[in-house]
């Protein structure tokens, strides 16, 4: 089974959006038995909190369930447990590396590395959850293409 961990700062906006958008794509492709998806934070600020209302609004509008999701922090052991550690921006990469240590297998990457490169803007600061969703969707589509090869 392929295991993917999406990572952002607080695990309430971008990474849970990516987690559930990707799960939806995987389910529609009939790959749920081959790919496992989760998400986590690099910080402890939001641990135990549900997804942000902006993320919930996007997921609700798409009919995508996020039941039972609460923010958790990335752990050092996640490096051994996951095949892909997919961050939303360069800041997340730096902070994730501080938690997991060395990356000899090259598991750390950014979601938009699968869709032309760049960072996914944090809607916590921009307030633009629609733009974040478009970037997340594009990145997840690119990642799924790689996984299906």
Report each predicted region and the residues it spans:
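Phosphate-binding/catalytic loops
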Residues: 78, 84, 90-149
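Helix N-cap/beta->alpha junction signal
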Residues: 15, 89-90
